[in-house]
Amino acid sequence: MFKKDRFSIRKIKGVVGSVFLGSLLMAPSVVDAATYHYVNKEIISQEAKDLIQTGKPDRNEVVYGLVYQKDQLPQTGTEASVLTAFGLLTVGSLLLIYKRKKIASVFLVGAMGLVVLPSAGAVDPVATLALASREGVVEMEGYRYVGYLSGDILKTLGLDTVLEETSAKPGEVTVVEVETPQSITNQEQARTENQVVETEEAPKEEAPKTEESPKEEPKSEVKPTDDTLPKVEEGKEDSAEPAPVEEVGGEVESKPEEKVAVKPESQPSDKPAEESKVEQAGEPVAPREDEKAPVEPEKQPEAPEEEKAVEETPKQEESTPDTKAEETVEPKEETVNQSIEQPKVETPAVEKQTEPTEEPKVEQAGEPVAPREDEQAPTAPVEPEKQPEVPEEEKAVEETPKPEDKIKGIGTKEPVDKSELNNQIDKASSVSPTDYSTASYNALGPVLETAKGVYASEPVKQPEVNSETNKLKTAIDALNVDKTELNNTIADAKTKVKEHYSDRSWQNLQTEVTKAEKVAANTDAKQSEVNEAVEKLTATIEKLVELSEKPILTLTSTDKKILEREAVAKYTLENQNKTKIKSITAELKKGEEVINTVVLTDDKVTTETISAAFKNLEYYKEYTLSTTMIYDRGNGEETETLENQNIQLDLKKVELKNIKRTDLIKYENGKETNESLITTIPDDKSNYYLKITSNNQKTTLLAVKNIEETTVNGTPVYKVTAIADNLVSRTADNKFEEEYVHYIEKPKVHEDNVYYNFKELVEAIQNDPSKEYRLGQSMSARNVVPNGKSYITKEFTGKLLSSEGKQFAITELEHPLFNVITNATINNVNFENVEIERSGQDNIASLANTMKGSSVITNVKITGTLSGRNNVAGFVNNMNDGTRIENVAFFGKLHSTSGNGSHTGGIAGTNYRGIVRKAYVDATITGNKTRASLLVPKVDYGLTLDHLIGTKALLTESVVKGKIDVSNPVEVGAIASKTWPVGTVSNSVSYAKIIRGEELFGSNDVDDSDYASAHIKDLYAVEGYSSGNRSFRKSKTFTKLTKEQADAKVTTFNITADKLESDLSPLAKLNEEKAYSSIQDYNAEYNQAYKNLEKLIPFYNKDYIVYQGNKLNKEHHLNTKEVLSVTAMNNNEFITNLDEANKIIVHYADGTKDYFNLSSSSEGLSNVKEYTITDLGIKYTPNIVQKDNTTLVNDIKSILESVELQSQTMYQHLNRLGDYRVNAIKDLYLEESFTDVKENLTNLITKLVQNEEHQLNDSPAARQMIRDKVEKNKAALLLGLTYLNRYYGVKFGDVNIKELMLFKPDFYGEKVSVLDRLIEIGSKENNIKGSRTFDAFGQVLAKYTKSGNLDAFLNYNRQLFTNIDNMNDWFIDATEDHVYIAERASEVEEIKNSKHRAFDNLKRSHLRNTILPLLNIDKAHLYLISNYNAIAFGSAERLGKKSLEDIKDIVNKAADGYRNYYDFWYRLASDNVKQRLLRDAVIPIWEGYNAPGGWVEKYGRYNTDKVYTPLREFFGPMDKYYNYNGTGAYAAIYPNSDDIRTDVKYVHLEMVGEYGISVYTHETTHVNDRAIYLGGFGHREGTDAEAYAQGMLQTPVTGSGFDEFGSLGINMVFKRKNDGNQWYITDPKTLKTREDINRYMKGYNDTLTLLDEIEAESVISQQNKDLNSAWFKKIDREYRDNNKLNQWDKIRNLSQEEKNELNIQSVNDLVDQQLMTNRNPGNGIYKPEAISYNDQSPYVGVRMMTGIYGGNTSKGAPGAVSFKHNAFRLWGYYGYENGFLGYASNKYKQQSKTDGESVLSDEYIIKKISNNTFNTIEEFKKAYFKEVKDKATKGLTTFEVNGSSVSSYDDLLTLFKEAVKKDAETLKQEANGNKTVSMNNTVKLKEAVYKKLLQQTNSFKTSIFK
């Protein structure tokens, strides 16, 4: 069995192994093995050269190295001479031997090949090499042996690392045992499939392994050709067979005598390539160094312990800097007679080479050619080539023959040569014992003695001589110098650390170490030299001077005292007493600027802990702390610097800001008492809390911690303190305390007439109002109780001044100061922060209601806000004759809730003969209905025209700024509004904006040339500032100044009051809030941002707000707009609690918004939830205290959950205590919402508590106050929640405002208590009715918004939240889920843009309360049909449908029909009234409650258990329920046709479908007939509403159940097919004008009249008296009263007597005898004026096929049948305006009265209509019959009927006579004796002819006559 020799080469600490590997099967009995490492390096280091030893190495050494030199010198001289030259020449090879056992054979591996030392006798490599070197035997051509390196030296040089035995490692060559030579068969070459060049950082990949092939290829011999390798002497290679070679990385075919081109694999590189393993049965062949392919090592099969060898795979360095090659070849072992598999090659993918490569030529197969010296082998990827398969006959088996040892005997004595032995003896004898180690020297002695004995002995043979020679030589060679102790001492010295010793002793050590190392490295050093070096180095080590222990300084912490603006750096110091520490310096920098330096020296640096404090640091600035320590350990001063530490003080605390007032509240026994004027300290403070009211934030409640008396800055005060988590307050020096402090002044008693306390001042003046009173300091009116409406109710006649020539102020007036002042003086006193909120009171002013006598107010400035009902003014309401106000100023807001046009003025309301001069006003005036001006709205001189005009009732030299915005202005102007007749307003300037009013003067007095105009002069506006109307002639002439001109003019007025500043009171100074201007880093350019950020981070201190604000871009909206509110959102839902949010909406005062995204932040305070605004990098905190409110929430819940909607609590609250109380609650329709509120109480109450007043700490008194308030108002609170929950779920785009309305009312910028607002809403029944939602908003909710009414509020939100540009589209969008809105504009060109849309109609006063209910439909499905005259409300449920989609088609058809109807009337109506169709208040049309399951009861139930949602959600809350009354529908009309209470109610019938539309035309006729359809003349006297609808103006349809279809009427709505089967015009839209309609009506009536006439002629032609009496009946007069004027129609059969006397010869006889065909209408009395469900006679429809011949001309009002019939005939003959209006309306009533007629009669009317042509209707009818007969006789338009062609009267008459004749055959006598006849044939013919003529003439667009 064969075993392989494995060879590998690796880089060994900078020494590159050779490239090719080789192996050879060896001699038969190799018993031992050794590992050889051949190192090829062009230059061995000088250190290695110095250590080369001459002679032979000790064979007992396990490891040694043999050194060869290229044979470049003549082979002369000794080894010493060679070593001498060694420094100048190149060492060529180094063979490292690792010896494990006895060596069987030696392989010397050179750069290009293999040298084999063949025989067993040559197994000793030392001996062999020695012979080769000493005896000159050239066994290794080109090299000579130089010397060797011992194992220890190899270790020193780092070459020992290749000698590890444990496993196969790169860089090792192993010779292993080979037991028996065997033939090697079936060997294939291993080829590299590929070679990879990859970038340095690219990942390594493995390519697929090549497939194994069992086929054999012939071997190729390779002979060493590299001159750099030692060669085996000829003749000594007998035992070696040529080894088969595989070239790794090249392509070498194994065919004998063939040349193979080798493709070079890679270029050399500085980077090692990946290693690969190559295994081939037999002998692996090493590649050339320049062609070495990188192979990846692969684990080899494990060999027996004694045979294990370590392999190394060469690594090749690529020259391409960015790439490295990697290739893996896996070797395999093969056994005899087995096919050798081709090695597997793992090849990563090849990346593109950056440079081209060249392929060197190969001279002979198996002998690679090295590149020229000036070339490098190029690197290129190798494309694998498949080797050709060797034919079977070429396969061969090769065997290695056994070597033979043959001994030939010769009988001659051999000579003995002892010369060499002698030489060795001489050499050994000359050795000195001091030059070598004792052991080696002692070992030489015995050998020398033995050698000498052999030398002296004669009978020795040459072998013995040789043996002893060799032994001696070996012993000499074994002489050595022992450097072990030296090396150990050097190693010990190197373990020393420089830092531990003094510089001088350390330097001495380094000197001696260097010397010792030279000795150790010197191979020629003697043992004595070594010993001396050891002694000196040991002594130097012992003399090292050790340094003292280094001190250790550690920065352990930085203690930030944020409130004190201080940071303390704390350190620990170790070894502080072992070394001299000179100083420790802590330096604090801000950027590069050194802020502070703390130097610690002496005893301050001897403690274990030290610190450095830095004070007066700025917040939010990054400081750098640098710490340096200087010390001396013995080498002089050393400096150590610690790592820099960043320090930043970030102050983030809760600070109460923008405080309006602070009150000390005592809550005890359910009563809240303001104790802000305490005079003693209470013993029990637990029921006290501070109530801090902000100008724009929530009120904060703080439990009082302590109240104490103290003196601050000389002022005795009560100091009230409170503490809360994170709460701080700012001290006078802008420092902080961790408590809130409020000071209450201890009253100071007055001194003479100088007063220091407002309460005492009021009491004094009230007691004696005639004296002079002076203010000794500024004082607050807060919490002082007035004596009435004003603080001082008695008439003030004294003086009010400031003392000591100063300007003091009375602050925080909450009521007017005086009622009346007479002959009084108020001078040099300011009134600041006036807060008079009395919206329910009249005559509100800061100083007085009335100013009389010679009263004077001068040098006074007022600031603040006043609100009242009627008459609100800044100073006084009314100035009387002789009074004067001069050099005064008002800054603030005035608001009037007036509805009657009272006066609102910045200075006064009215000035009657007084003087106002040098007044300055900068204010905003708002109100409902008021006369308003910023100075004085009314300047009144009176009617006395005397010489004082212009000196009294004067307003002059004044200036105004600000704005006036009054909803319903009554003479509004910036300066003044009313002066008639001769008040004087002059020389004044306005910078103000007037929203709805005049820019300067507010009324047409300015154009009154007789009186007022001349005294209104020199009024100036300012370009770019002032605005408003200039509606009057003179107004347009007023000058507009530039800003510069205006300022200059104002300067000439010498007004100083606007600049008056009062001294703060001592108390005000103590409680003064620091302005932002005093805060660090304040920037005036960001002032708006700071104010706005109070809304984004409401809790945080001003310093933090400034810090955050300064991060913004100056142009950002947060710095350029005013923020009203900031609200958290989660997607599109408003978050009003502490639930998670992901964005905020910022609402600005200009009605715009921004959204900003949020991310969570962990940097908030314990009681403040914080987010980061990711868009801006600043913070946001919800305005909710983060605390546990569970107890309070549960307490409130327990109070509310016990209250039911139907309960005694609720009855008492709403004052519904009678029998109707249950239904009164039901009438609110709030059950569903109330249930929803009760089911969500916990959530709702939590939000309520969180959004109510802030409770920063735990105040039991405050909690109890809230509980008691809820208990007291529990019913109101629940109703408030229920109401808002029910009606304010309004959608704007993607958002719904319900959460805002419930818990975030301050969204709109008004500060409000959520709890108080809810209680207010639920406090009155009128506030929570569904039918008053619009009104309730204005009365209760408007004041909390920026809108005056619901319409404005909804519009504001639309603009804010959506991109929808109008309210109508928004309303459709907001209701689309539950309301379908069909809007129809007119198709008449001139009115197509008229108001018709739903929301426009709904917002009118009579319908505006429907808006919120419609916006909050939840389950029902409603529809609206809106046009310019009416709006209809219906539901899908009423139609039996379940969704809006189910009803859209039918609703749309109805909407079209409604519109067509009104358009028809607009085309028809008289010009003077048609515009009335465009109603401002459209007619509401309400659906009934006849649900599919039956009539619904009032509260939405039917079929006992079903809920009718349209009633529950809309009709019921709107109070539109009505009981079933048996009607189909009805209209509610009033005497005034424009009465907004007018409406239409469907009862049994539906509003849609054709009949529903027809009913629509019926009911709206009732609404519109008087004012529009009848020309504005109203109903004709003696008739009423029902006479005009059905049977006259209602559009007839089929299927109604009534007899109107086929009766007289007009189709105003529907388009029908012109198919010859129609009764009415087929398309009413084709009648474009009134003339078109009249033409239609003419043809319509002509045709009917002609057919009546022909029927009569045909019957009469039968000359049958019985037939006549059966065919006709009578329309008789039935007088309504005794005056026999007004009549009814009495239709009856002829009496027997009349039958007997009946004589009919012509149509005229029928007329005269008032006869009609005996068909419908039926017999009875028909009353046109009846309005009774029991009398249906006015509803009569006159069938078109019924011939009515009589006229029944009345002397008053006609009967119903005659009225309708005559109206149509007159319309047809005389047209709409003359005929129809003349007859059907009261058009001639007034004229008839003038003409002396008591009643309006037919007789009078026909004369008027016919212009006296006819005196009776009968005359008219006879003429009409004659006219149509005459026209027909001349010819008819040709038509065909019943198969007959008709073109003349005679043709038609013939057909009728035949029909009558047939009918006459049915004449019979009934049992009662009356004759009856069927008229069926005649009626059918008549109908057929009519319909044919209608078709033939296209609805009578052409005449029926020729």
Swiss-Prot record:
Membrane topology label: Multi-pass membrane protein; Peptidoglycan-anchor
InterPro entries assigned: LPXTG_anchor, Peptidase_M26_C_dom, Peptidase_M26_N_dom, Zinc_metalloprotease_ZmpB
Start and end residues of each stretch annotated as Disordered: 178-436
Compositional bias per record (Basic and acidic residues), positions renumbered to this chain: 201-239, 252-262, 271-335, 352-375, 383-408
Family: Belongs to the peptidase M26 family.
Entry protein name: Zinc metalloprotease ZmpB
Cofactor, free-text remark: Binds 1 zinc ion per subunit.
Cofactor(s) demanded: Zn(2+)
Cell compartment(s), UniProt: Secreted, Cell wall; Membrane
Primary localisation category: secreted
Binding residue positions for Zn(2+): 1562, 1566, 1586
Keyword Transmembrane in annotation: yes
GO molecular function (one): metalloendopeptidase activity
Pfam families: FIVAR (PF07554), Gram_pos_anchor (PF00746), Peptidase_M26_C (PF07580), Peptidase_M26_N (PF05342)
Function: Is a virulence factor capable of inducing inflammation in the lower respiratory tract, by increasing tumor necrosis factor alpha (TNF-alpha) concentration in the lungs. Also appears to have other functions important in virulence in models of pneumonia and septicemia.
Record region (2 X 15 AA repeats of K-V-E-Q-A-G-E-P-V-A-P-R-E-D-E): 277-375
Extracellular side: 128-1906
Motif (LPXTG sorting signal): 73-77
Single GO cellular component term: membrane
Organism (species): Streptococcus pneumoniae serotype 4 (strain ATCC BAA-334 / TIGR4)
Region: 2 X 23 AA approximate repeats, residue numbers: 293-375
Alphabetic keyword roster: Cell wall, Hydrolase, Membrane, Metal-binding, Metalloprotease, Peptidoglycan-anchor, Protease, Repeat, Secreted, Signal, Transmembrane, Transmembrane helix, Virulence, Zinc
Gene behind the chain: zmpB
PTM annotation: The Gram-positive cell-wall anchor motif LPXTG is located in the N-terminal part, in contrast to such motifs in other known streptococcal and staphylococcal proteins. The protease could be cleaved by the sortase and anchored in the membrane via the two potential N-terminal transmembrane domains, whereas the propeptide located prior to the LPXTG motif would remain attached to the cell wall peptidoglycan by an amide bond.
EC number: 3.4.24.-
